Swiss-Prot record:
Species classification: Bacteria, Pseudomonadati, Pseudomonadota, Gammaproteobacteria, Candidatus Pseudothioglobaceae
Gene Ontology MF term list: exodeoxyribonuclease VII activity
Catalytic activity field: Exonucleolytic cleavage in either 5'- to 3'- or 3'- to 5'-direction to yield nucleoside 5'-phosphates
Cell compartment(s), UniProt: Cytoplasm
Name of this protein: Exodeoxyribonuclease 7 small subunit
BP GO annotations: DNA catabolic process
Subunit comment: Heterooligomer composed of large and small subunits.
Designated gene of the protein: xseB
NCBIfam families associated with the record: PRK00977.1-4, xseB
Keywords of this entry: Cytoplasm, Exonuclease, Hydrolase, Nuclease
Length: 74
């Protein structure tokens, strides 16, 4: 069973990957590995955001929240 994804840690890890890749000090192989990990983290972060958006929508529907505005996508 895999660990539960931590969104905040995912963002921190993405920032570290970006800094490492922008430094220009990585070999081609390391750059590809970092890029691959970054893509996976991006997918996990997006999935976590989608789940949060769905939960917010569900909760506001249950409470008949009438002032709901759609969330903006980045």
């Amino acid at each position: 069973m895999s660990e539960k994804f931590n969104f905040n840690q995912g963002l921190i890890d993405l920032e570290k990957i970006v800094k490492a890749m922008e430094s220009g000090d990585l070999s081609l192989e390391d750059s590809l590995n970092h890029f691959s990990k970054g893509v996976e983290l991006t997918k996990q972060c997006q999935s976590a955001l989608n789940k949060a958006e769905q939960k917010i929508s569900m909760l506001t529907e249950q409470d008949n929240y009438t002032n709901e505005k759609p969330l903006k996508r980045l």
